[in-house]
Amino acid sequence: PTLLEFGSPTCGHCRAAQPLLASALGAHTGIRHIKIADASGRPLGRSFKVNLWPTLVFLRNGHEIARLVRPDNTTSIADALAKIDIAE
């Protein structure tokens, strides 16, 4: 299971989401978390149809299971993580 986090170091919403992500990921140690520094015109972000930052894409076996755009609470992140965590 993998969490792709598309964002930018200069994005205020991205910085605000960091404590929420850290809290939610604490219970899911088997999930790989990959931060992707995105920018206008970057092909990887476009291939995942990312329009706003942060966008979290939750993958299991290479397939998108869930997506959150600008998450603002730990519960929504934890719920999406539970959907991809094979340990649960």
Show where each model-derived region lies:
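The canonical Cys-X-X-Cys-His
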Residues: 11-14, 56
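Non-catalytic, surface beta->alpha helical segment in thiol-disulfide oxidoreductase systems
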Residues: 52, 57-88
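Typically the conserved alpha-helix immediately C-terminal to a functionally engaged Cys/Sec
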Residues: 13-27
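Short active-site neighborhood of thiol/selenol oxidoreductases, capturing the structured segment around
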Residues: 1-9
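A short glycine-leucine-enriched loop at secondary-structure breakpoints
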Residues: 47-51
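Thiol-based oxidoreductase modules, predominantly thioredoxin-like and allied folds used
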Residues: 6, 25, 29-43
